[in-house]
């Protein structure tokens, strides 16, 4: 969708609305080279961690063990949501600090971080859709992910043209259709999994509970960032002090986020020992949890 959306965006703003080519290209560059690049990082991590579970799906389905295949798919989706949901919340609440950390150009910081905070939600849907695509392919339904993508592409293209033609959303229209595209692929894939594999997910356990824990995590991370930034205020007087202060505050906020999310997930029973063991380095995570007496 990237090249198609870029073409539509550039042509409609320049040819139809008379926007300057330099300004339009700059705005698109901030979106694609900053906000999208950052949002893709947790998607890659979530996919890498969860894809370790996928080979078992093919093996179970080859043995005609549909119950085992359903269990494997459900576990993969659950682990992905456990990783993707806090990643999305973290990007949303720490969008400005993270953008400053990776792309410290002050002239584009506000726009890039605001786009990232909106785009963060796609982390959840793209991460899970990557797993469901692989699951559908594992059960021999190779064409279904293409159908999902095709349906989503048509709808998001129509919506993008309408938004650019009839609103002044400008580059934010690209964010909105990116969200729409990710949600549609997620929804259509979920339908296919229910139809062809009989999967019924526990929405409360797989999505709502991690979301509540992630919300608490986000509040803690935001508070820690603010407090550490205030404490490190004297660093502003140093050369590039604002940047180093941001590094310190962001690192503290991320550490707080990991601790709060891990603690609330374990204490609430949202994540279980067997969930941790199904992840790469799961034994290490279990030992760490035991040492912390969680």
PLM region descriptions:
Residues 6, 179-230, 259-275:
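C-terminal transmembrane helix end/exit motif
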Residues 43-63:
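Helix-loop junctions and terminal segments of transmembrane helices
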Residues 33, 80, 116-119, 123, ...:
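Residue-level recognition of transmembrane alpha-helices
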Residues 23-46, 78-82:
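Alpha-helical transmembrane segments of polytopic membrane transporters and translocases
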Residues 132-161, 172, 179:
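Alpha-helical transmembrane segments of multi-pass membrane transporters/permeases
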Residues 72-102, 170-196, 211:
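Short alpha-helical transmembrane segments in multi-pass integral membrane proteins
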Residues 225-294:
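Membrane-proximal transmembrane or re-entrant/amphipathic helices at the cytosolic face
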Residues 74, 92-123, 236-241:
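Interfacial segments at transmembrane-helix termini and the short loops linking adjacent helices
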